[in-house]
């Protein structure tokens, strides 16, 4: 699922470190999470769409690597992010 420009701006405003932040780990994880949620909903209806499933697995892996990086750099930023995104239950 592609995100519209307005959706991206809203997510970046909420999770970015400053106004024009698009590259911080928090911003990237938030954008990936939104795309993962959309693709998960798509796959619930289209169970045999294996091409999209592979894309989903790649996105989940990329998000996992970014979260691992964030734990090494700043554990408090990591904890804040997963709590705001609701990733761990």
UniProtKB/Swiss-Prot annotation:
<comment type="function">
    <text>One of the primary rRNA binding proteins, it binds directly to 16S rRNA where it helps nucleate assembly of the platform of the 30S subunit by binding and bridging several RNA helices of the 16S rRNA.</text>
</comment>
<dbReference type="InterPro" id="IPR000589">
    <property type="entry name" value="Ribosomal_uS15"/>
</dbReference>
<keyword id="KW-0687">Ribonucleoprotein</keyword>
<keyword id="KW-0699">rRNA-binding</keyword>
<dbReference type="InterPro" id="IPR009068">
    <property type="entry name" value="uS15_NS1_RNA-bd_sf"/>
</dbReference>
<dbReference type="GO" id="GO:0019843">
    <property type="term" value="F:rRNA binding"/>
</dbReference>
<keyword id="KW-0694">RNA-binding</keyword>
<dbReference type="GO" id="GO:0022627">
    <property type="term" value="C:cytosolic small ribosomal subunit"/>
</dbReference>
<dbReference type="Pfam" id="PF00312">
    <property type="entry name" value="Ribosomal_S15"/>
</dbReference>
<dbReference type="InterPro" id="IPR005290">
    <property type="entry name" value="Ribosomal_uS15_bac-type"/>
</dbReference>
<comment type="subunit">
    <text>Part of the 30S ribosomal subunit. Forms a bridge to the 50S subunit in the 70S ribosome, contacting the 23S rRNA.</text>
</comment>
<dbReference type="GO" id="GO:0003735">
    <property type="term" value="F:structural constituent of ribosome"/>
</dbReference>
<keyword id="KW-0689">Ribosomal protein</keyword>
<protein>
    <recommendedName>
        <fullName>Small ribosomal subunit protein uS15</fullName>
    </recommendedName>
</protein>
<comment type="function">
    <text>Forms an intersubunit bridge (bridge B4) with the 23S rRNA of the 50S subunit in the ribosome.</text>
</comment>
<comment type="similarity">
    <text>Belongs to the universal ribosomal protein uS15 family.</text>
</comment>
<dbReference type="GO" id="GO:0006412">
    <property type="term" value="P:translation"/>
</dbReference>
């Amino acid at each position: 699922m592609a995100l519209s420009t307005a959706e991206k701006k809203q997510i970046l405003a909420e999770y970015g470190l400053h106004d024009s932040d698009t590259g911080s780990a928090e911003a990237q994880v938030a954008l990936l999470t939104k795309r993962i949620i959309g693709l998960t909903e798509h796959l619930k209806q289209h169970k045999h769409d294996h091409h999209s499933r592979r894309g989903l697995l790649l996105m989940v892996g990329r998000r996992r690597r970014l979260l691992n990086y964030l734990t090494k750099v700043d554990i408090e930023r990591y904890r804040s992010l997963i709590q705001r995104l609701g990733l761990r239950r």
